[in-house]
Swiss-Prot record:
Belongs to the N(4)-acetylcytidine amidohydrolase family. It comes from the Bacteria. Its EC number is 3.5.1.135. It comes from Escherichia fergusonii (strain ATCC 35469 / DSM 13698 / CCUG 18766 / IAM 14443 / JCM 21226 / LMG 7866 / NBRC 102419 / NCTC 12128 / CDC 0568-73). HAMAP family: ac4C_amidohydr. This is N(4)-acetylcytidine amidohydrolase. InterPro entries: AC4CH, ASCH_domain, PUA-like_sf. Coiled coil: none annotated. Residues 6-101 form the ASCH domain.
Length: 103
C-alpha cells in the first residue's frame, strides 16, 4: 500500500470529495508542496486513503490576512476559519495556502 502524501481531519473529507473545500492552510512543515503536485490524501485519524488531489496554486498568508475568500474555499465563515487555524496551530501566525482539486 502506498503512503499518503497529505492528511486531513476526517470531518473535512465530505467537503473535499464534494468540492466544497478547495484549499488547505498549513504551517511551515508542509510548505514544500508545489503547483502540479499530485498527492494521495488520507484521513489524519487513521491515515485511510480517500482521494487524490492536484495542487493548483500555493501562496503564503498570515492569520491577520485571511479573507472571506479563504473562508469560502474552506467552506467556513471567516471567524470559524481563524478559530480552526488558531486551534490547530496555536501561537503561529505565518501559514501556507495550498489550493487543490480532486482528480
Amino acid at each position: 500500500m502506498q503512503p499518503n502524501d497529505i492528511t486531513f481531519f476526517q470531518r473535512f473529507q465530505d467537503d473535499i470529495l464534494a468540492g466544497r473545500k478547495t484549499i488547505t492552510i498549513r504551517d511551515e512543515s508542509e510548505s514544500h508542496f508545489k503547483t502540479g503536485d499530485v498527492l494521495r490524501v488520507g484521513r489524519f485519524e487513521d491515515d485511510g486513503y480517500f482521494c487524490t488531489i492536484e495542487v493548483t496554486a500555493t501562496s503564503t498568508v498570515t492569520l491577520d490576512t485571511l479573507t472571506e475568500k479563504h473562508a469560502q474555499q474552506e467552506n467556513m465563515t471567516l471567524p470559524e476559519l481563524k478559530k480552526v487555524i488558531a486551534d490547530i496551530y496555536p501561537g503561529q501566525t505565518q501559514f501556507y495556502v495550498i489550493e487543490f482539486k480532486c482528480l
